[in-house]
Amino acid sequence: MKRHLNTSYRLVWNHITGTLVVASELARSRGKGAGVAVALSLAAVTSVPALAADTVVQAGETVNGGTLTNHDNQIVLGTANGMTISTGLEYGPDNEANTGGQWIQNGGIANNTTVTGGGLQRVNAGGSVSDTVISAGGGQSLQGQAVNTTLNGGEQWVHEGGIATGTVINEKGWQAVKSGAVATDTVVNTGAEGGPDAENGDTGQTVYGDAVRTTINKNGRQIVTAEGTANTTVVYAGGDQTVHGHALDTTLNGGYQYVHNGGTASGTVVNSDGWQIIKEGGLADFTTVNQKGKLQVNAGGTATNVTLKQGGALVTSTAATVTGSNRLGNFSVENGMADNVVLENGGCLDVLSGHTATNTHVDEGGTLDVRSGGTATTVSMRAGSVLLADSGASISGHYDDGGMFSIGDGRAAGLTLGAGSVFTLQEGDSTRDTTVNGGQLTAHGGTLEGTTTLNNGATLTLSGKTVNNDTLTIREGDALLQGGSLTGNGSVEKSGSGTLTVSNTTLTQKAVNLNEGTLT
């Protein structure tokens, strides 16, 4: 992690050399306040002899152009325009041997400055700069005001009392906003190149103080530390916001927001392709999830006063806490119980062992996952929905065509498994009248009862010995029967076009009839 702007500076008189020299005051902890650079008064400057390489721009004076190199100092109480700064950081991060650079004192102004590698611009309290461009290896230490800084791989460290407005952070650039500092209208274009939620920490924007109206674009990242606050942030696709502190009124326009343990997010709006993730110990309040947006609340996470609009997705488990409203009214997930949850467009509810869900509505694109020992009652499954369960769960509900289904006491009946759905039959259990429409039926032993139907895209996976004393029917389209053995006095019937592929399976049935199609 880069550190060399985590330093405040002061000018002191060296009695041996008879010159002004720079003394740094290091802040060893990035979250702690550093010493404040001492602003020189005009009287102090004029009373101190300076070397030829050290220049002073007096109050009321304007200097245009020039280059600072080789530890030169420019002390600005007037106005400096168009300077190039190539000195001040030659010795690297937090090195007290660093001297030189541009000093903007109380009342001083610098415009259109270029800071190259190894260069440092220091803006003390009461000083102001505008339109500074900082390249890789260069930096700006800010205790005054800076407007329209561009970080092309360079760094801007905003100390207590400093205000940075309109900073643009490009690839490998870094803005650190310390406690007591403010950054407004920042544009972040870097920091997330390491992938979602990767804590790069040395690029993008790191907030210990306050960040207001930040725009996070593709590859951009804002990290809000435990003591930091971000207000009115907009995150676009490919960008993300990592919250350990406080985030207020964030809008996710395809971007991601991660709320970590101890972090809080209030008033987040999740639009199409946006994703808010609440991790264990994280808290979200008053989140609004619009169509194609997603709210994910992990085990131990909390989201309250959620507004889940039609087409929005909720991803959670009964180990989380989520309360709010959806298109059917109020819903809740708390204390191991879920009620009136709507799942669609990538939404998913995991019902854990010993936990309960009631009145669950699983619409197109939604998934209900009931673990062994979990219970779900009054379930509504619509076309395009997904059920994940095994015979150790307890489930009752209906499909949108009116068909009823149930799982309980090791017996399943009336299941229809569409694409993505998986039912696992455990040894010693049974399933009756199961229809597999592109989903998967996995049997670790057990018994197939009634008519088991495999339609196009269906998979029946056997492990061990499974008994079929009734009828296994394969209709239109292709299906796969793989592994294990199928025994008993039942029959296998292939009808309709398509191919039944039998792979590593032993069939011991009363009859195997190929009426139409192909058996391979």
What are the functions of these language-model segments?
Residues 1-41, 45:
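Bacterial Sec-dependent N-terminal signal peptides
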Residues 42-520:
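Beta-strand-rich extracellular passenger or scaffold domains
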